[in-house]
From Swiss-Prot:
This is Thiol peroxidase. Disulfide bonds join 60-94. It comes from Ralstonia nicotianae (strain ATCC BAA-1114 / GMI1000) (Ralstonia solanacearum). GO terms for molecular function: thioredoxin peroxidase activity. The active site is a conserved redox-active cysteine residue, the peroxidatic cysteine (C(P)), which makes the nucleophilic attack on the peroxide substrate. The peroxide oxidizes the C(P)-SH to cysteine sulfenic acid (C(P)-SOH), which then reacts with another cysteine residue, the resolving cysteine (C(R)), to form a disulfide bridge. The disulfide is subsequently reduced by an appropriate electron donor to complete the catalytic cycle. In this atypical 2-Cys peroxiredoxin, C(R) is present in the same subunit to form an intramolecular disulfide. The lineage of its organism: Bacteria, Pseudomonadati, Pseudomonadota, Betaproteobacteria, Burkholderiales.
């Protein structure tokens, strides 16, 4: 079990973040139209998994916008914005913001994702949500970069995540 902080207060996070060089765990989450979306649906594409507690928070919204802008300049790359938000809310956010390179996905039907990716918040006021993390995958779903952000209120290391795609 990993530990992160929320405003400096310790929070326990269950599961283990996938290791660089490992094959990413398969998953099936819920898209904005309530249909299942799997990692395999994007076979052959590079992926940035922007895992956030909720798109209704400023830092989560900012990271989603920044990754959308960054991958607009890259070929064969998609951003998954993964949270426990309901698919309707996540879809509305991406549509309203014009985030064409982001696929919003919800964990609300599958808590297994949180454990498989080491982002299952177990304690504190955000228990049940996903911790902030970024996992970058190549076109064959090998992990190129993985960061569990140590302070939930802080943004991820964009430069390190995007450098993994170069």
């Amino acid at each position: 079990m990993a530990n992160v902080t929320l405003g400096g207060n310790p929070i326990e996070v269950g599961g283990a973040l996938p290791s660089v060089g490992a094959k990413a765990p398969a998953f099936t989450l819920v898209g904005k139209d309530l249909k299942d979306v799997s990692l395999a649906d994007f076979a052959g594409k590079r992926k940035v998994l922007n895992i956030v507690p909720s798109l209704d928070t400023p830092v989560c919204a900012t990271s989603t916008r920044k990754f959308n802008e960054a991958v607009s300049k890259l070929e064969n790359t998609v951003v998954f914005s993964i949270s426990a938000d309901l698919p309707f809310a996540a879809g509305r956010f991406c549509t309203t913001e014009g985030l064409d390179n982001v696929v919003p996905l919800s964990t609300f039907r599958d808590a297994g994702f949180k454990q498989a990716y080491g982002v299952d918040i177990k304690t504190g006021p955000l228990a049940g949500l996903t911790a902030r993390a970024v996992v970058v995958l190549d076109a064959n779903d090998n992990v190129l970069h993985a960061q569990l952000v140590p302070e939930i209120k802080e943004e991820p290391n964009y430069d390190a995540a995007l450098a993994a795609l170069k």
